[in-house]
A protein has these predicted regions:
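Short, flexible helix/strand-to-coil boundary loops that buttress conserved ligand/catalytic motifs
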Residues: 72, 81-84
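Short S/T/G/P-rich N-terminal loop/turn motif that feeds into the first structured element of a domain
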Residues: 1-56, 63-73, 89, 96-114
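Nudix hydrolase/Nudix homology domain
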Residues: 83-86, 94
């Protein structure tokens, strides 16, 4: 059963432009370097007004819990995790299955679009 893995990242100080670019580049490499995920998104909040100090969000989907576990152990992910922890990041992670009880509005059928 597929699942969604979401992580919010809070750093004790704002990342520099270079650090933010490095973080994004590391995550952007995952679809090619790690694979395993069916979706990978990363961004910042539009206003920062309601984030309670969490400045970045990572959104991924995996086909099953086995793929998530492989991703978590993958050397490229471990390197990223070490990088954020070196910057005293406080991550907040949430994983849940995607099924009839959690998908409240299905994605539109993109194949039907012109």
């Amino acid at each position: 059963m597929s699942l969604q893995h979401i992580v919010l990242f809070s750093f004790p100080r704002p990342l520099s432009e270079q650090e933010a670019a490095t973080m994004r580049a590391m995550i952007a490499s995952w679809p090619k370097e790690i694979g395993l995920m069916s979706k990978c998104r990363f961004g910042t909040d539009l206003t920062g007004e309601r984030t309670r100090g969490y400045g970045y969000l990572l959104y991924t989907e995996f086909p099953d819990t086995g793929a998530l576990r492989e991703y978590q152990k993958h050397p490229v992910h471990v390197q990223f995790l070490n990088w954020v922890m070196e910057r005293e990041c406080t991550p907040l992670a949430f994983d849940y299955h995607l099924d009839q009880s959690t998908i409240l509005a299905p994605e539109p059928d993109t194949a039907a679009r012109p």
